[in-house]
């Protein structure tokens, strides 16, 4: 069992943040992000995914933990160190935009249903 708050990279190079304890096989790599703030971990996971999920890995050529050493990920930095506060701010902003879009979508669906119902 692996600890929650870590990131996995599967055999295809797809990275996922895990906020729960989980099990895995030898086709996943675990990146230890548990000591980072949650939203910074989500940002780091997205950066890993962008670098690793490129189509290079498939059933014939799996991603393994050793491949993680070859990844180049780009993170915002401040004074030569990762800027985790900025990462958290960016992910928080993206989450708010997604929530706003979902609410607007739901409002449009409700309005359309009401319009159809009034015609019945």
Language-model regions, residue ranges each:
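DNA target-recognition domains and sequence-specific DNA-contacting regions of bacterial/archaeal
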Residues: 1-72
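Amphipathic alpha-helical coiled-coil/heptad-repeat segments
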Residues: 71-120
